[in-house]
Amino acid sequence: MIVALLYLILAGAYLLVIPIAVLFYLKQRWYVASSIERLLMYFLVFFFFPGLLVLSPFANFRPQRRQVQV
């Protein structure tokens, strides 16, 4: 029973908790990241890809519309 609970906690962290943190990190740092930090971002997306796929229908992090001054 303990092992099943441990697997459930690890699966929840891998598929939900950490990918949510990765999405917010990418949203905050995407346009200002250095090259090493961008490499870390690519690794995180590669490593947590299944969780990001699970969350992708619900996440909407498109850039905000620009305000054009006339």
UniProtKB/Swiss-Prot annotation:
It is an enzyme of class 7 (translocase). Its EC number is 7.1.1.-. It is found in: Cellular thylakoid membrane. The chain crosses the membrane at residues 2-22, 39-59. Keywords: Membrane, NAD, NADP, Plastoquinone, Quinone, Thylakoid, Translocase, Transmembrane, Transmembrane helix, Transport. GO terms for cellular component: plasma membrane-derived thylakoid membrane. InterPro entries: NADH-quinone_OxRdatse_su_L. Its main location: membrane. It catalyses: a plastoquinone + NADH + (n+1) H(+)(in) = a plastoquinol + NAD(+) + n H(+)(out); a plastoquinone + NADPH + (n+1) H(+)(in) = a plastoquinol + NADP(+) + n H(+)(out). It is a multi-pass membrane protein. GO terms for molecular function: oxidoreductase activity, acting on NAD(P)H, quinone or similar compound as acceptor; quinone binding. Disulfide bonds: none annotated. Belongs to the complex I NdhL subunit family. NDH-1 shuttles electrons from an unknown electron donor, via FMN and iron-sulfur (Fe-S) centers, to quinones in the respiratory and/or the photosynthetic chain. The immediate electron acceptor for the enzyme in this species is believed to be plastoquinone. Couples the redox reaction to proton translocation, and thus conserves the redox energy in a proton gradient. Cyanobacterial NDH-1 also plays a role in inorganic carbon-concentration. NDH-1 can be composed of about 15 different subunits; different subcomplexes with different compositions have been identified which probably have different functions. HAMAP family: NDH1_NDH1L (MF_01355). This is NAD(P)H-quinone oxidoreductase subunit L.
